[in-house]
C-alpha cells in the first residue's frame, strides 16, 4: 500500500518560518537541531536562538514554544495517514506496527506521538544491510532510497534468473521436438 499525503516535513518548516518570522532555511535548521513533536518532552530551561532578520538582533525562544508549533502539524499529518489507511481498508493490518522512514522520523517525540495516534507500535526504519558505509547509511533519511535500490536489485536478479531458466527450458523443448 502506498499513498500520498500533501503535508510533511516541509510544511512543518513553513509553519516554523511563519510563526517565528524567520527565513525558511533557518526554520529548517531550527527544526532539525531543536525540534520536538511532543511539547511535554521539552524542559522549561531549554531555549532556541532565532537569528534576527533585517538587522534585528537574535532572540530566544523556549523549546516548548517551538514544540507547540510542531506538534499540531505532525498530529494532523498522522491523522491524515490514519484516515488514508482506513479509507484503503488496511486499519486491521497496522496492528503489527508502523515503520517510519525519512528525516522526520529522527525528530524527538515523533515515534511517541505516532504511537498515541495510531494506537500501535511505531519504530524508526534504519537501513542495516550495508558493509563499509554503516555510519553514513544507517540513517532513516536514506531508508526509502536504499529500499528502492534493494528492490530494484532483487527484481533484476529475479528477471535474469527467469531468462536463464527460460533459455534452458527452450533448449530442452527444441531437443525434444527435434527427436520426435
Kindly give the residue locations of the regions a language model identified.
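Helical "lid/coupling" subdomains associated with nucleotide-phosphate turnover
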Residues: 1-180
Amino acid at each position: 500500500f502506498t499513498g500520498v499525503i500533501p503535508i510533511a516535513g516541509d510544511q512543518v518548516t513553513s509553519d516554523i518560518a511563519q510563526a517565528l518570522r524567520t527565513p525558511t532555511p533557518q526554520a529548517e535548521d531550527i527544526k532539525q537541531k531543536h525540534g520536538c513533536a511532543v511539547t511535554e518532552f521539552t524542559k522549561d530551561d531549554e531555549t532556541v536562538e532565532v537569528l534576527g532578520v533585517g538587522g534585528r538582533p537574535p532572540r530566544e525562544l523556549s523549546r516548548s514554544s517551538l514544540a507547540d508549533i510542531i506538534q499540531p502539524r505532525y498530529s494532523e499529518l498522522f491523522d491524515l495517514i490514519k484516515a488514508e489507511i482506513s479509507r484503503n481498508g488496511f486499519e486491521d493490518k497496522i496492528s503489527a506496527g508502523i515503520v517510519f522512514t525519512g528525516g522526520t522520523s529522527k525528530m524527538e517525540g515523533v515515534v511517541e506521538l505516532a504511537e498515541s495516534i495510531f494506537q500501535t507500535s511505531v519504530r524508526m526504519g534504519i537501513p542495516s544491510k550495508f558493509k563499509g558505509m554503516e555510519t553514513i547509511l544507517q540513517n532513516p533519511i536514506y531508508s526509502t532510497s536504499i529500499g528502492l535500490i534493494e528492490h530494484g536489485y532483487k527484481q533484476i536478479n529475479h528477471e535474469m534468473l527467469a531468462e536463464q531458466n527460460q533459455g534452458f527450458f527452450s533448449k530442452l523443448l527444441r531437443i525434444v521436438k527435434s527427436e520426435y
